[in-house]
C-alpha cells in the first residue's frame, strides 16, 4: 500500500461506523498493512484454505512448545506462521537454506515480532547453539532417503537432553490425492509407522498425531493427510 493510501485511511474523514473498530484504521496509518510472505501469498491467491491448514500446524506446535526458553524452526520458508509459535515461547530463531525466502522474512519483520533468522544447510553441518525445542514442518519429505540421517542428526544436534522436537510431514497415503504443486519436491513421504520408526532412532519417546485439513486427531492413520511426530528424551 502506498503512503497516500495510508494517509487516506488515517485521516479524519475515514471513521468507522462503530468506534471500537477505529483502531484498525489508525493502525494502518501508523505502520501500514501486515504483508503475506512469498509462499503464503501464493497460497492465499491459489487455494486459500491451504493457508489455514498450514497455520493450524503452527498452532499445534505453539501449544506443544508453550513456555519453552528458546525454540528453533528448521526450514522456515517465508516464516508466515512462525509468529504463532513465537507468541507462546520466550525466544525463537528460524533457519532455512534458501536466501530468497530469508530476505522476504527480513523485509517483513516488524519490531514487535522480531526474531533471529539465518541461513544454514542442514546437509552440510549441524546447527550451533542450544535449544529446548526444535520443529520442522513440511521439510523432511524434501530430504532424500540417503540424506535423511545426516539431516536429522544435524537438525537435532542443538536440542538439549530435556528438549522436545516436532516433525510434521504429508503422509505417504495422501500423495495420490495431492495437487501437482503440493507433490513437487516430495521425495521422502512416509506412512505413520515409518515416521514413528524413523524418529525412534533418535528419541526414547515418540507420540504420533494425524491431521486432516486443520483438525489434529489420533484416528485411523492411513486416512490422514498429514502426520506429526512429537518427540522427547533424546537417545
Predicted regions and their residues:
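Short glycine-dipeptide loop
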Residues: 159-165
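Short catalytic micro-motifs in class I SAM-dependent methyltransferases
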Residues: 138-142
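Conserved N-terminal segment of class I S-adenosyl-L-methionine
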Residues: 2-135, 146-153, 158, 188-194, ...
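Short, glycine-/aromatic-enriched active-site segment of Class I SAM-dependent methyltransferases
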Residues: 167-187
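Activation segment
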Residues: 126, 143-144, 176, 199
Amino acid at each position: 500500500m502506498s503512503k497516500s493510501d495510508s494517509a487516506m485511511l488515517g485521516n479524519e474523514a475515514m471513521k468507522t461506523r462503530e468506534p471500537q473498530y477505529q483502531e484498525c484504521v489508525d493502525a494502518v496509518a501508523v505502520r501500514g498493512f501486515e504483508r503475506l510472505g512469498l509462499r503464503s501469498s501464493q497460497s492465499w491467491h491459489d487455494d486459500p484454505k491451504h493457508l489455514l491448514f498450514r497455520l493450524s500446524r503452527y498452532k499445534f506446535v505453539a501449544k506443544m512448545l508453550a513456555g519453552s526458553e528458546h525454540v528453533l524452526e528448521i526450514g522456515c520458508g517465508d516464516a508466515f506462521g512462525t509468529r504463532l509459535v513465537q507468541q507462546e515461547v520466550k525466544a525463537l530463531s528460524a533457519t532455512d537454506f534458501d536466501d530468497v525466502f530469508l530476505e522476504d522474512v527480513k523485509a517483513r519483520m516488524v519490531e514487535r515480532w522480531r526474531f533471529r533468522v539465518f541461513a544454514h544447510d542442514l546437509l552440510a553441518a549441524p546447527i550451533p547453539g542450544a535449544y529446548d525445542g526444535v520443529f520442522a514442518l513440511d521439510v523432511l519429505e524434501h530430504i532424500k532417503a540417503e540424506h535423511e540421517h545426516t539431516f536429522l542428526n544435524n537438525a537435532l544436534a542443538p536440542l538439549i537432553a530435556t528438549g522436545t522436537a516436532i516433525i510434521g510431514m504429508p503422509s505417504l497415503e495422501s500423495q495420490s490425492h495431492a495437487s501437482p504443486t503440493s507433490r513437487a519436491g516430495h521425495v521422502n513421504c512416509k506412512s505413520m509407522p515409518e515416521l514413528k520408526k524413523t524418529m525412534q532412532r533418535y528419541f526414547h519417546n515418540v507420540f504420533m498425531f494425524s491431521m486432516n485439513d486443520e483438525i489434529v486427531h489420533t484416528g485411523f492413520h492411513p486416512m490422514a493427510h498429514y502426520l506429526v511426530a512429537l518427540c522427547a528424551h533424546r537417545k
